[in-house]
């Protein structure tokens, strides 16, 4: 099969024109709003969830159990959801691969839809909790907490 023995069913040439329609302005004096959650840093989330985020795939099971237990004990009162975010990364990663994982996790931890975040590490992974914490920069210490399972009694 090649271009000599195949044929297209397309005929002619279609011209495309982009004609955007202007959006009418809101009448003055009418303010727009939505029900959201303002965070201390000024960002606004549309959800108020508790996120349990592992720094390494080795603690995925623990993060699931922590989220399940929290859902059972609180009945989800006052929050939209309690969610664990498992992944298979953070251990034995190097270079750009390791940095990309850290950036994705950082962006999740700092996301305004998370009203509270528990970052869970193992303690021996490449993506160490201490170094990851430094990567967050200035963060709300009341909203974001850390746990290393190898250091917990």
Task: Name the predicted role of every residue range.
Residues 1-153:
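Metallocofactor- and cofactor-centric catalytic cores in central/energy metabolism, strongly enriched
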